[in-house]
Amino acid sequence: EQTEAFEEIADKVEQAQEDGSQAPEIPLTEEESILPEYGELFLQNPDMVGWIKIEGTNINYPVMQTPNEPNFYLKHNFEKEYSDLGVPYIQEDCDIASSDNLVIYGHHIKGQKMFGALESYKDKDFYGEHKVIQFDTLTQHGEYEIIAVFKTVAYSSEGFRYYDFINAENEDEFNAY
């Protein structure tokens, strides 16, 4: 099952974190190398651009990006095989290194699978205990504090068009968003 496959991938990351000094350095650019815990997975699938994890949930997944096939991972697993669950992926026009807003897509499935666990944020106490999302790029660890939670109908004229905002012209525009 796909859930077991995600657990195996997460186990590889955790094992690499524990064995960090033994992992080979994999250069991504002249200036940056891939973090040791993600090197093996990147070699397995270079569409991987990061990792998302939220403590207290099952969210602990690789994050993919395929600009030329934007929704590829909506219905494909990490091994690029067909899968109803897919893999979380970043919107095609987001630049992982410089965009102000990274839109990460993933299925909302009941029973806490995939991003279904985000429903827990309806509970103020849960939010109070889980205010941080870990999102690592291949080269940097990152932690982000949740400042808002909303539910909207995507691509609806009445919905919040979060997917239209990638970069702000200035700080005021970013804050207004």
Predicted regions and their residues:
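Solvent-exposed, non-transmembrane regions of membrane-associated and secreted proteins
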Residues: E1-Y177
